[in-house]
Amino acid sequence: MITVRTIPELRAAIAAHPGTGRPGKGRPAFVPTMGNLHDGHIALVRQARPLGDVLVASIFVNRLQFLPYEDFDSYPRTWEADCAKLEAAGCDIVFAPRESDLYPEPQTFKLQPDPQLADILEGHFRPGFFTGVCTVVMKLFSAVFFASGGGTAVFGKKDYQQLMVIRRMVQQFALPVEVVAGETARADDGLALSSRNGYLSTAERAQAVQLSAALRALAQAAQAPGAPPLAALEQQALQTLAQQGWAPDYLTVRQRHDLQPPAAGAAAGTLVALGAARLGSTRLIDNLEF
């Protein structure tokens, strides 16, 4: 495994990789991360391994997707541990640009995603978040896939809305990138693995599973014969979580394909329950397809 910092170094490393010398081959598989890797990230890397001829993972904490009061400065940087995990998972190239490598000048040209998809849920509570995500992902896609003419990128379902936004971006710009979804990795008690779980106190960690439990309960209630309107079920779920000591932003059921409220009688297998809530000072998100 090798590490590169700049876009020219990355493109040269991809071109020089032994896998790119075979006829008809040379397409990268790519997993973007912000570092502080856990088993969920590594599962995505292992999933990506057979999907390309050279496996690239990026580590870059993207300032553009943090709000001024969020944890950009305190976000854990665990470089040596991350590299060891990536190498063990079969990664070929780690792209770890400095901020000056990816943003050599002020990023005044940014991507504005579809507001119907990006200004709801996470986008409502974190305005500008998906502009930052789309801008950096477009830059990373350009860096990784430009020379090869395309490839595969793996994103986790844990960040469900982000996955939908990236897929829409790829579709709208006709990018030669296949976006593959990875299942959410969970702890034994059901808590979705997240880099921010490390912020939880011991007591909060024991309580954190309540978020995934609330989503399961909401999904089950929504599917029950003669169920009340979704708005009433969502309000009840919010109240229950608040009574347990959380500060919820949203608990809601949406259509998977566009994250809009479902039509009456929506078929099973087309919906997703999504939630975001703060436990103490830590904001967690999760989702459940059903």
UniProtKB/Swiss-Prot annotation:
Reaction catalyzed: (R)-pantoate + beta-alanine + ATP = (R)-pantothenate + AMP + diphosphate + H(+)
Keyword field: ATP-binding, Cytoplasm, Ligase, Nucleotide-binding, Pantothenate biosynthesis
GO terms assigned for molecular function: ATP binding; pantoate-beta-alanine ligase activity
Residues at which (R)-pantoate binds: Q65, Q162
Pathway per the UniProt entry: Cofactor biosynthesis; (R)-pantothenate biosynthesis; (R)-pantothenate from (R)-pantoate and beta-alanine: step 1/1
Signal peptide: none
Positions bound to ATP: 34-41, 156-159, 185, 193-196
Main location: cytoplasm
Protein EC: 6.3.2.1
Active site (catalytic residues): H41
Function: Catalyzes the condensation of pantoate with beta-alanine in an ATP-dependent reaction via a pantoyl-adenylate intermediate.
Family label: Belongs to the pantothenate synthetase family.
Protein name: Pantothenate synthetase
